[in-house]
Regions:
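Walker A/P-loop
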Residues: 91-113
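Conserved interdomain hinge at the start of the Helicase C-terminal
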Residues: 268-309, 315-320
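Conserved nucleic-acid-binding Ia/Ib motif block in the N-terminal RecA-like helicase ATPase lobe
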Residues: 118-170, 328
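Conserved pre-motif I regulatory segment
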Residues: 27-31, 49-52, 57-98
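Conserved helicase ATPase core of P-loop NTP-dependent helicases/translocases
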Residues: 131, 146-149, 154-156, 305, ...
């Protein structure tokens, strides 16, 4: 019930790499004081298994029901699909809300707090998300004092608190703060991170009667999504990933043919993605095209977000746009507190936001953004959905969203990554338009695409 084959082990084994230290099976069960402890997500299967054997289980419910919250006056109105989600989820004590970015998972979760009416702890994995939750709760529940644990601060109130899961783990002995057992309702934002060992440890100590997970991408690249469902429960409400009715969705695919250095095109060995990224960062012509396209977008009234996977690349793009007279803000990892505060202060007025994907890939909320420049290639559909979600926020006057994708056709590894993105774009309802790049070099490898009915060739 609580064990599964580890996909990472078998993938590593298939590649003939060493599997030392990689478990063949992963178990989320444990023996505790003579009892077999199963994750809450296994409850339905355990009951079904017992009933198949004509065994009627007896229940001794020791869950924490929490302190009642009687005076909650919400300053918002849920949309119909959000009300439907709340109505469905409240039929269950635990489970996951699976909805795409821009559905409004945060406000729906606040609606669940109002519905449950018990003290609540919201668990996040980053300080950025903690701050965003603080802002939303102060807006939608202004009469409630919000506590927080994380980012160097520890000020829980016991009514509605927000915490980074890392701040609940004692680094010396890996023990979990007993505080987590005092809440009747736990909300786990971006719950696909639950497979992280320490995050799972935190949730194992939760006694709350109600547990709600929020995610846009429950599938994980490592195949460990079963841990998520065991820890938080099954998906109780899923919003279909249908083509967005509010926006016209287009991907501009720029096919580039710059010849990579010899070491990347050796036929006897596959290049490392880190080496390919290094070449892309140092490719002046490619970076100049991205900067030029972003500049043109601003001149045409667009609000672009430029995403890359390397901090030095973000700085380079930021510097070039600034030199062209474009107001630009850069967001990246390892920023000092003063730098982050300065960036946040200029975020609303900046014409272009340049960022690393890991910094703004989840939870980043700037509704006016309508154009995404994918300056570095990625492959995983979950990451692409998160990135695309940054431009799907509702904003007055926004009717169209556009993604600019730069495909380096001369390198097979980058072509293969694009084929995965291409499939994901179509699944998200985007129309694809193909453009030849600005290189005067002849293509060494042509992009193998078969335009579909919603694809235009330029």
């Amino acid at each position: 019930l609580a064990s599964f084959s580890n996909p990472v082990f078998f993938k590593t084994q298939a590649l003939r790499f060493s599997t030392h230290g990689i478990p063949r099976f992963i178990s989320c069960a444990r023996i505790e004081n003579g009892y077999l402890a199963l994750p809450r997500g296994c409850l339905d299967d355990a009951i079904a298994l017992l009933q198949e054997q004509n065994i009627s289980p007896l229940f001794d419910d020791k869950r924490e029901t929490g302190k009642p919250l009687l005076k909650l006056t919400p300053e918002f109105t849920l949309r119909k699909n959000q009300r439907d989600a709340v109505a469905t989820i409240t039929k269950h004590d635990f489970g996951i809300l699976h909805a795409p970015t821009a559905f409004g998972k945060t406000v729906t979760a606040i609606g669940m707090i109002v519905k449950r009416k018990v003290n609540t702890l919201i668990l996040v994995h980053s300080r950025q998300l903690l701050e965003q939750w603080q802002e939303r709760l102060r807006t939608f529940l202004p009469e409630v004092t919000i506590g927080s644990i994380g980012g160097g601060k520890r000020k829980p109130i016991g009514i509605i608190d927000i915490a980074t899961y890392q701040s609940l783990v004692n680094k010396k002995d890996n023990s979990i703060t007993p505080l987590i057992q005092d809440y009747g309702h736990i909300i786990v934002d971006e719950c696909h991170h639950l497979s992280a060992p320490r995050f799972e440890m935190v949730l194992n100590e939760v006694r709350a009667k109600y547990v709600l997970g929020l995610t846009a991408t429950p599938e994980r690249q490592d195949g460990h999504q079963k841990i998520i469902f065991m820890a938080a429960g099954p998906i109780r409400y899923k919003v279909k990933q249908s083509p967005d009715e509010q926006f016209t969705q287009t991907v501009m695919i720029h096919q580039l043919y710059d010849i990579p250095p010899a070491e990347l095109i050796k036929t006897d060995e596959r290049p490392k993605i880190s080496d390919a990224y290094r070449w892309l960062v140092n490719n002046e012509q490619r970076t100049s095209k991205i900067v030029s396209d972003a500049y043109e977008c601003v001149q045409n009234g667009g609000h672009p977000l430029v995403l890359t996977e390397r901090r030095e690349h973000a700085e380079s793009i930021h510097s070039r746009l600034t030199e062209m007279g474009i107001s630009t803000v850069v967001l990246k990892g390892a920023m000092k507190a003063a730098e982050r505060k300065n960036a946040d202060n200029h975020l609303q007025s900046a014409q272009v936001v340049v960022a690393t994907g890991k910094y703004v890939g989840e939870g980043f909320d700037l509704p006016r953004l309508d154009t995404l420049f994918l300056a570095m290639p990625i492959a995983w559909k979950g990451t692409l959905a998160q990135y695309a979600g940054r431009i799907h926020r509702e904003s007055e006057g926004k009717t169209q969203v556009t993604i600019h994708d730069y495909v380096d056709c001369a390198l097979p590894i980058l072509q293969r990554m694009f084929k995965k993105r291409e499939k994901s774009y179509k699944a998200m309802g985007y129309a694809l338009e193909y453009f030849e790049g600005n290189s005067d070099k002849q293509p060494s490898l042509k992009l193998e695409n078969v335009p579909s009915s919603n694809t235009k060739q330029k």
